[in-house]
Curated annotation (Swiss-Prot):
It is found in: Cytoplasm, Cytoskeleton, Spindle; Vesicle; Midbody. InterPro entries: TRAPP14_C (IPR055452), TRAPP14_N (IPR055453), TRAPPC14 (IPR031626). Component of the multisubunit TRAPP II complex, which includes at least TRAPPC1, TRAPPC2, TRAPPC2L, TRAPPC3, TRAPPC4, TRAPPC5, TRAPPC6A/B, TRAPPC9, TRAPPC10 and TRAPPC14. TRAPPC9, TRAPPC10 and TRAPPC14 are specific subunits of the TRAPP II complex. Interacts with alpha-tubulin during mitosis. GO terms for biological process: cilium assembly; regulation of cell population proliferation. Its main location: cytoplasm. Keywords: Cilium biogenesis/degradation, Cytoplasm, Cytoskeleton. GO terms for molecular function: alpha-tubulin binding. It comes from Danio rerio. Residues 84-111, 494-513 are annotated as: Disordered. GO terms for cellular component: midbody; mitotic spindle; TRAPPII protein complex. Pfam families: TRAPP14_C, TRAPP14_N. Disruption phenotype: Morpholino knockdown of the protein in early embryos results in curved bodies and small eyes. Morphants exhibit reduced ciliation in otic vesicles, neuromasts, and olfactory placodes. In a knockout model mutant animals show head to body ratios lower than those of controls. They have decreased brain cell proliferation rate at 24 hpf. The gene is trappc14. This is Trafficking protein particle complex subunit 14.
Amino acid sequence: MVLMMESQCEYFMYFPAVPISDLSDPAKYRTLPRRSHLYLGETVRFLLVLRSQSASGSSDGSCGSEQHSSRSWRELAGSLSAVASVSPGDSRQRTQPLYHDYHSSGDECVEDTDEDDAAEAVGCPGRGGPRYRGFRECKPLLIHNNPGNGVREFRRAPVQSPVDEPVVLSDEVIFPLTVSLDKLPVNTLKVKIIVTVWKQEEEKAEIQEHGYLSILQQKSPCQTFRQDLNTFKAQVSTTLNVLPPPTVKCQQMTVSGRHLTVLKVLNGSSQEEVCVRDVKILPNFNASYLPMMPDGSVLLVDNVCHQSGEVAMASFYRMDSESSHLPSMLSALEEQNFLFQLQLNNQPQDDSNEGLEVPLVAVLQWSTSKLPFTNSIYTHYSLPSIRLDRPRFIMTASCPSAVRTRENFRVRYTLLNNLQDFLAVRLVWTPEGRGQKEDPAVNAVVCHSPLSNLGYCRKGSTLSVSVAFQILRAGLFELSQHMKLKLQFTASVSNPPPDARPLSRKNSPSSPAVRDILDRHQASLSLGRSQSFSHQQPSKFHLTRTGSVMERRAITPPVGSPVGRPLYLPPDRNILSLDKIAKRECKVLVLDSHN
């Protein structure tokens, strides 16, 4: 009977959408609503039902035959065991990719640059690469569910959940089973749930004494497992669709020296309401390690911060507001923005990890009403990394909050130098931008001292200068953006190659830009090996780092210059870093004098 029992049973898998409190009555669980899809990361509770065809078919026979069949079925059903496993059914890429990979690169960082912003605490690597405005989609890294809401919770709350032990009825046996979908790839589209059913029997004394290895070495496998051929063994499987977690997009920006991160959570895959319980941004120091080597050793990434005192687990503070309270319910295609501000810990300069990348990860805790056996799901997303680049040379400005039109007032500019010694520091008022249209608002500002020479500036010192202004019309005006910094500092100039042609005005081209470069280079050599740095706020059209721009011009060889004798210019290795210098905005409100 046992030999053919597998084929004499019907197998059913039920995925109830609500908890089950009683399995004694088959009519109850058969009429419960069933789930048509699952969520990646949840714990799935389902039922496997084995229904005996012979037990139901023997009711037309004699009473003795029916009792014998029922007794045999109960003996067999009581000795059966079942275990469930899960595997990806389909992990191919979706038609419209939901995730895009941005792994710790400079292009990951999203800065919506604004001419009034100044870089203060953090920056982005790879400033020479392309810039992207708006939100960028973040890739899920890891998905897991609440560990305190697993099988143990079913035992603690038997009233709301099915029992763990199999239930044997007159013609069927019910196995309550559990599988977790938190060990699957993040791009899984379908899952295959496999259940193996077998009859548990005690091992022979010979096997318990010697073990299978010794017996297989002495006997043939067919002889050893001959009796196991009559043991009940069956395997059933089903495939279900899997919905991905909510979509998370990220935008990073720096406003007035404060680093802000906006996370956009979108319910773009489920027609059910998604409850966002918590959102966090944490440093991901696990990204500092490379994959394990064959010998078991682990290497560190050089440019990635392995531990940081500045960026701690609580450094990203979520700014709560009326529109972003938690928990938050998101309907289908509904999104919610969450604003985070980076709060760095004060660290000595020697202990600072400045210049190193700090990988970030976002942790989203969410759930739906269709998760009857999972309290919540935690999804980890990869965020663009940040780099600790505090400016060491800062220009601040202060002025009256409000003045009248055509009224003379003064703006006090203060320079805080913690960068290096400078031979000369000058402030130049440059309202016109290079190659840009004139701004009528800027033309209304009259600077009475467009050039201020502050002289030598030692590292650790503070310089101040007062500049007189007059504004001709009413409005709100910014007085730091167009105040250009000119810094002169010593620089080591390497020896020119022997075949390099010296720079001279005799063979210089007629291009004014080239001649200006040559003149400034000759002047720098005569001033004791110094270089000049011009710091100018970028316009909105420049997709460059907020707060600093270096002017670079190409030098064209003169017409008719000898082939193979290039122009020699000193390398730019000593050019100041753009992230080390910043300017703070200063705005004044101009009121109409007639009012």
